[in-house]
Structures are given as C-alpha cells and as structure tokens.
Amino acid sequence: MSGYTPDEKLRLQQLRELRRRWLKDQELSPREPLLPPRRVWPMEQFWNKFLQDGAPWKNVIYKTYRHSIFAVTHVLIPVWIIHYYLKYHVTAKPYTVVERKPRIFPGDTILXTGEVIPLIEGFPXQPS
C-alpha cells in the first residue's frame, strides 16, 4: 500500500488550512500596533516645544543645557563625594594623638615668634 489514506489526507489538508489562517492572522492591519500614549516629563515637554521651530540658537542653548547637566551629574557630584570622603574619612585627623609640648628652658628661642625666654634670677646652675 502506497500513499496516504483518506483520513491522513483530510488531516494534512486541515493542518495546511490552519497554518494558512494562522499566518494570515499574523499580518498586522494598518491600525496596528496600537501604542499607548507616551508619558513625557515636564522638562522634556518644555524642550520639545522650545526646539519645535528648529532655530540654530535654540539648539545651541539646548546643547549647552545638556552638557551642563552632564558636567554636574558626571563630574561635579562625584568630585564632591570623593572630596568629602577624603576630607573626613581618609586623612589623618588633627589632635587624635595627644603629645606633650616640648619643654622650654631659659635661654631657648621660640621659633614662631623669635622670642627668647629670659633667664630666671637666682636659679642655680645657670650659665653666667
């Protein structure tokens, strides 16, 4: 016996028809796809209206605005954060280690002012 039985032929014909209908259903109508309205932020809405006429000076203003936003968000704020971290968390803090001040003896000179400490009258073991 060669070939398909009548039941197999009918089944294959129905599968082909089903495939054709499925492929036809996949074609989009001119109204599809229906996209939801896009939400626009207030600043974006402002710039869209501002740039509508396409004047060159408006493009320059917009580009300056965009570059300044980039500079603030990608340069200034990270630099401030790094500066804060280095200033308050990494550098050695003053007055954390308490040391005695060096002793001052009669006849010594104070470096900051150049003042000479006077000799004490009647103090034993002073060079004369």
From Swiss-Prot:
It comes from the Eukaryota. Keywords: Acetylation, Electron transport, Membrane, Mitochondrion, Mitochondrion inner membrane, Respiratory chain, Transmembrane, Transmembrane helix, Transport. The keyword Lipid metabolism does not apply. One of its GO terms (biological process) is mitochondrial ATP synthesis coupled electron transport. The gene is NDUFB6. PANTHER family: NADH DEHYDROGENASE [UBIQUINONE] 1 BETA SUBCOMPLEX SUBUNIT 6 (PTHR15083:SF0). Accessory subunit of the mitochondrial membrane respiratory chain NADH dehydrogenase (Complex I), that is believed not to be involved in catalysis. Complex I functions in the transfer of electrons from NADH to the respiratory chain. The immediate electron acceptor for the enzyme is believed to be ubiquinone. The keyword Transport applies. The lineage of its organism: Eukaryota, Metazoa, Chordata, Craniata, Vertebrata. It is a single-pass membrane protein. This is NADH dehydrogenase [ubiquinone] 1 beta subcomplex subunit 6. Pfam families: NDUF_B6. Complex I is composed of 45 different subunits. The chain crosses the membrane at residues 64-86.
